Every structure is written in C-alpha cells, then in structure tokens.
Amino acid sequence: MPLFGMKSSTSQKDLQKSNTSDLSLQGKASSELALDGWHTIALEYSVDWPLQLFFTPDVLSKYRKVFQYLIRLKRTQMELEKSWTAVMHQDHVDFSDYCKDRKNSSATQLRRLRTKPFWRVREHMAFLIRNLQFYIQVDVIESQWNVLQTHVQDSHDFTELVTFHQDYLSALISQSFLDIGSVSRILDSIMKLCLQFCWSIEQYETGANMFEIDHITEEFNKKSNSLYTILRSSRLAGSQRAPFLRQFLMRLNFNSFFETTARGVMNSGRLRPGTASTQL
C-alpha cells in the first residue's frame, strides 16, 4: 500500500519571528531571510511495486515542489486572516474604552489612528495572495486535472498514461511559474514579506519599529509591481504556457491599480500605506 506522510527538519518550536528586526539593520530584501521552518515541510509518498514505475523519483519531486508551494501560500493567507481578526478584536476593545471614557482615551484613539494605515496594506497583501491562490488552485490545478482525466479515459496503454501524467505535472509547474526563476523568487519574497508584516504588527504594541513596517510595505509594493510587470510581458502573456494568465492579470488589475503603479506613476512604484485601500 502506498503511504503518505509529511516531514519537516524544523519543528514549529523553532519559529524565529524576531528576524523582522533585521530589516532595519541590514536593509536587505525579505527573500534573503529564512523566517522559520515551514519551507522545510515536504510531502513524502512511499510507493510499492509496481507503482514505482509510474511514481518515479522525478514525479515525486514535482509533486513535492507543488505541495510546498501550496502549503506556503495557504499559510500566508491564514496569517493575514489571523492578523486581521486579532487587530479587529483589539480595535473593538479600544473603541469600547473610548466610548466609556472619552476624556481619558487619547492614547487609545492615537493607537487606532496609527494602525489604520497598516490594515490598508494588509488588504493589499491579502488581495494579491487570494487571487494568486485562486489562480493556482482553480485556473491551473483544477483545469489541468480535468484535462488529465479526459486523457486517462482515452489512453490505450501504460506508455500513454505515463506521458499524459508527465504532461499534467509539467503543466502544473510551468503554469504556476515555478520553473521561472525570476517569478518564483518574487513570489517567495512576497510571501515572506506578508509574514514579516503580520509578525511586525503583532509586535507593534511591544515596540516594533515603524521603520520596519514602512520598509516591509515599500518592499512589498516593489515586488508586487515587479510581479505584475513580468507576468504581463509579451514573453508570458503571448505564450501558451499559461492559458489562464490573462484572467489572473485581469482580476489583479480590475481597477488599473497594478498597471498604474507598475508604470512608476506613484513615486517610482512606492505606495503609501493609505493608497492601497482606496484602490482596492
């Protein structure tokens, strides 16, 4: 019987959320920081004979690659949602305190005013991650799975079946841009920046530097603009490697926000925290 499993060389106890403080000291892109052990989580699949002829090491490696990408994408989405829930709860508490004692609640009001721009940035991040996740799971995986099922039903021998399955995996890799170094590095940086933003917000009340959050915001907007610029390039948009790329770009740029910022109209691609929400 084939066995499924997950393994990680780093436990969750080893999470190092304090790495966000390095931003103000090093000024490096977040893609250079190893935030925690989530990137080491891998899918393991033990195959018995004769399925080893079908699930070769190369096939399992491709499944692992897609799995790691999906789990990191989902984890980023969950962190963004969790941060919103936590701060909305605190905001309701602050508002309640303000209503009870308006004369002595200036500090509470000041905190609410300071944190509002952060959640505009968070919504910008969540917007990109949600659309990317939808594209990968629906436009890529689900559509290619339907194609594979059709081909399997029409296959006549084992060789054809192997070929169709290889085509399926290759399509997942290519249409998810995992085989394009420039795109995969940007996606990796975007997810790390989202996590750093969430963790910085959690530490805000305990002394997180405003410069850190501003730096993360600036880097995120640079990376997201770069991603949009690359994906809409003629090399990708005009090819057949990503047939649903146009729909993905349309969802991202439904109000011309990405197109405007990618052209450098807004101060060389830098967005202020209050800008994203008005556009999104």
Which residue stretches match the model-derived regions?
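Extended, charged interaction scaffolds in large complex subunits
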Residues: M1-L280
